[in-house]
């Protein structure tokens, strides 16, 4: 059995579910935003078979002991039904406890393959950390400054020349696109002090690479545009791009060091053809590329999951009293709950 933890009506999860089920495999979606308001979770400490169950989007109750692969796609959404909660504190309690219970139960009772492990996913989502890992693996990375100081930003732009600015993490809601920053000395110092931002040297060129990594398999698209951020306008030349062996090896090294089984990577090619690392999204979007490139990424990803399931079925499933996974906090993601 393959499980996907995601949000209600997530197009990626639904498309992959359809592809996997066509292969005669069992695939269920557990809606991380649909725990509140129904009997969605159950766990007992005695470890008997069936002592850990989750309710799927179809309303079925499945035992985690039967699952072999867990696609950790969108695990930490707020609840769509707050189960009668009215105040902000009550809603926070519902969201935290639903999130914590789901993550904790999975960490304690799921013994198959994570796509990708929760702690690795969290760590790899740190853009500063992943830049350091990519650099150590031999990638060229943009010269980068994370700062709240106008003076530091001014000095940095004078050192590197053309500079872009983007969020360190970002927020839910409208996207904040990458932008040029010119003459930072003309902005008030207080505008820099509100929160840290990421400042990077501008990489010359118009060839962007979107690299979809599913296990050892990689499928790339070449996006040609002069825009800093290609995402707002996809009405540009986009086509499949063959991944060179050297790049494949470097990317594999980065993903292994990050502990990721999959990743969606953004690169930019210099005018000389050198790939420059921009970032990896541990659970990035890929469906939009199918109609633009003709690459059947849904089928490729379904093959990746079913191969992982077959590999797990060939191994002995650990007993219930085997060593529990480390760092449950990385999985539960609870905040401000106390002890």
Feature-to-residue mapping (PLM):
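Short acidic-glycine loop/turn motifs at beta-strand connectors
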Residues: 45-48, 57-58, 213-217, 271-273
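A long amphipathic alpha-helix within ATP-dependent nucleotide-binding catalytic cores
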Residues: 193-196, 201, 229-275, 298-310, ...
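A short beta-strand motif that forms the metal-chelation/ATP-contact edge
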Residues: 211-213, 273-288
